[in-house]
Swiss-Prot record:
Disulfide bonds: none annotated. The gene is pdxH. It comes from Brucella ovis (strain ATCC 25840 / 63/290 / NCTC 10512). This is Pyridoxine/pyridoxamine 5'-phosphate oxidase. GO terms for molecular function: FMN binding; pyridoxamine phosphate oxidase activity. HAMAP family: PdxH.
Amino acid sequence: MEPVKMTNSSDDFTQSAEPFKLFAEWLADAAKSEPNDPNAVALATVDPDGLPNVRMVLLKDFDETGFVFYTNYESKKGQEILSAEKAAMCFHWKSLRRQVRVRGPVEKVSDAEANAYYASRPRGSRIGAWASKQSRPLESRFALEKAVAEYTAKYAIGDIPRPPYWSGFRIRPVSIEFWHDRPFRLHDRVLFTRPTPEGDWNKDRLYP
C-alpha cells in the first residue's frame, strides 16, 4: 500500500487560523486512509442525572455553521440532546494518528435539510426509520422484522415520507481541538474557542 499524502504535516497544522478549513483537510486525509467510515464520530450526551452517554454516529454534513448528524428524536440520544441542548463529539483516525474534539450547543436542522437527506437514503433505511422504535425495549428480532415487513407493504408504491420524529441535529461549536500524535507523547494540540457560535475564534497551543 502506498503511503497517504497528507495535506497538512504535523508541523504546519498548528499555524492554521481557520478550524473548519483545517477540519475539511483532515477529513479528506481520513477518507484516503481509513478502511471504514472516515466520518464516524463518537457523540457524547448527558442524561437528566448528569451521567454521560457516548456512542458512534456518522457525520453527514458540516460547514461554518456546524456539524450535522441524523437520528430518531425519540431515541435516548435524541431526548438527551433535546433536554440539555449541548453535546460533544470526538473524531479519531488511527491511520493518521489524529483526533478532533468538538463541543457546543445543539440545534435542530431545518425540515428542508432533513427532507433532502432522508430522500437520499436507501429505501431500506427509510423503511427502517419507521420500523425501529429506537432505544426502546425490543421483544425479539422477529418483532423488528415484522415491523419492517408491515412498513414495506404500507409504502410499497411511491415515496416514503420522513417520520416526524426523525431528523437531524447540528452542533454549533464553541470549541474545536486538533490533536496529532508525536513521539514520546509530546503531541501537538491546538485549541480554537469562541464565546458563542457567532463569535470570533481564539486560538491556543496546548501542552500535550
